Amino acid sequence: MNQKQLTKLRTMVPEMKRVRHIHFIGIGGAGMGGIAEVLANEGYKITGSDLAENVVTQQLSHLGICIFFHHHRDNVKNASVVVVSSAIPEDNPEILAAHEARIPVIQRAEMLAELMRFRHGIAIAGTHGKTTTTAMVASIYAQAGLDPTFVNGGLIKAAGKHAQLGSSRYLIVEADESDASFIHLQPLVAIVTNIEADHMDTYQGNFEHLKQTFINFLHNLPFYGRAILCIDDQVIRTLLPRIARHITTYGFSEDADIKITGYEQKEFTSYFMLERVHKPILKIQLNAPGRHNALNAAAAVAVATEEGVEDEHILQALSFFQGTGRRFDCLGIFPLQPVNGQQGEVMLIDDYGHHPTEVAATIKAARVGWPTKRLVMIFQPHRYSRTRDLYDDFVNVLSQVDILLMLEIYSAGESPIPDISSCALCDSIRDFSHRMPILVTDHEKLPSLLAKQLKENDMVLVQGAGNIGKVARTLAECELKVPPLIQKESHYA
């Protein structure tokens, strides 16, 4: 953004007085890094710290942001405010130093709320689908020439980044319920895609507490705001009488205000109709597979319709939607000959889904789009607590693939829980389905173990939220040894 554009932006969005230097602890997280990038482009001095370099820190470094790859009290020197990720413990030396120096320490969502204060905020929340829905809303607004600012939890492929500073009054953000911090946000429009039991440690294991927090989030809307809610979700349906705001519902249900009909899927493309109240029916061609993505698109259309975006821009944006990183992400179609000497090809898909509902949606999209392919899944459970809380659901959904290779649980900083392990999960799947999952205790052995299982026309699904994304890239770039016959861009043009 040039100085003229920034000056124009300042007429709508005043700068934060007395704030010149903002320090982020845990800056390598997608949400943290996105906010840091937007603030850097607004002209603030940004520094940050994290324990390891990643794609986010590399991108921020290219913007000239100073990043320390260690935590030390000197890192916060001269900061006006310190922003912390919920993953950072209270005894972090930088937090302690900030308190001693009387430097304000705030949560990520508090800074996101500050970005939203003088903007037209659109917040997308829900247990599943919020990253993709955020990307769809941002894509539609960009297609319409509205130049929004966005902050997303995943890479928006068309933009090549998680976040971007726009010149308009619109701010589109992913609202994270994992630590309940989304309650700080005060948008004008809010989407809730669904509500399921997840991150229950945050909510003291009380599902009613989780539901009430979502209601409180929606009641942050002004009386003239609007809640966009998926009526297919039974929890949301039961909560409707408790939500005292203007509501637009969407879904496959007959009583939805924006109703999906005639859904079909052909490989990576979804086709369906959207019936809207007092509006023309939209014939959608969506460049993303699965009924779950049709729901995400319906939510995005509801927001765009509310704002008066022309149908032409909506249709174009969804037709050319390039998706988000690690969401049914096709890394290529590879020949088998260099892998195990067999003839034919295999398709490699990388997917972030780590909750049973998300895994089931991925499997269903694969089965519908490619009914003749065997599904070979490499799965990495994420967190001991989630594996424990949703154990039976994991057993059920992981029994639905043809071949399963199971990695060890990615702890995400949690301590092990007795009797909760990938080995136990494999045993339970074996007892439940009589399938024979393969436990992989060493990532370096995965390529050879996988090669023994592969046959012509297989689809390999690399599934999970830990460090398994690196496994997928390694398989694509190194272990398969040859470039794919079809690059991923061919599916997301």
Swiss-Prot record:
Database matches in Pfam families: Mur_ligase (PF01225), Mur_ligase_C (PF02875), Mur_ligase_M (PF08245)
Protein name per UniProt: UDP-N-acetylmuramate--L-alanine ligase
Catalysed conversion reaction: UDP-N-acetyl-alpha-D-muramate + L-alanine + ATP = UDP-N-acetyl-alpha-D-muramoyl-L-alanine + ADP + phosphate + H(+)
Lineage: Bacteria, Pseudomonadati, Pseudomonadota, Gammaproteobacteria, Enterobacterales
Encoding gene, per UniProt annotation: murC
InterPro entries cross-referenced by the UniProt entry: Mur-like_cat_sf, Mur_ligase_C, Mur_ligase_C_dom_sf, Mur_ligase_cen, Mur_ligase_N, MurCDEF_pg_biosynth, UDP-N-AcMur_Ala_ligase_MurC
Function of the molecule: Cell wall formation.
Subcellular location: Cytoplasm
Pathway listed: Cell wall biogenesis; peptidoglycan biosynthesis
